[in-house]
Amino acid sequence: MTKLPIAREGWPFIVAPGIVAAGLALMGRRALAAPFAAAALASLGFFRDPERDVPLVPGGVLSPADGRVLSVEETEDRFVGPAVRVAIFLSPLDVHVNRSPIAALVAGTSYSRGRFLAAYRPEAEDANERCALHLQGDSARVTVVQIAGVVARRIVCRVGPGDKLAAGERFGMIRFGSRTDCYVPRGTDVRVRAGDRVTGGMTVLGLLS
């Protein structure tokens, strides 16, 4: 039996309105059932979790999310040090599952409460609710930050310190879109720029030096 490619966090959003829609339809209340059926179908799309053919690229840093690159900027990260940040905006139509950009040991996570500004706004990086995942690879450190937005109000990180992740492996999701930032060491040969579309676990953001 083929497993439906749906993130497990999505099932409550699919099953609950689906049951209500079915019950109303059986009662002959089709007009009332329609919005619940639409919500269930929309959630099927929102929480889809397709399999990905992860490329084997020596030194490659894979995109941790599907979406559009907002910016590529030099900055500082408390775990990585001097870094380049690739900010990726996820719309509600994108796949919301996050994947590890490198094969690594989870060195730590840090969660910060915050606001729910539009994720594409520059101040969302520091002001919004977020969860940072610090990854220790064989030769480099990388940080991935999940950032909530206007629609996304729930960050899910399934891993913790000491866990091991393969490159492209799922580690969490942001419900209903938002933003994911990837911090790589300065000197990384970044291969994307603002405006590019990227695919989580497949697009190579850059090559570690």
Where are these regions (language model features)?
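Contiguous, well-folded functional domains in the mature portion of proteins
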Residues: M1-S209
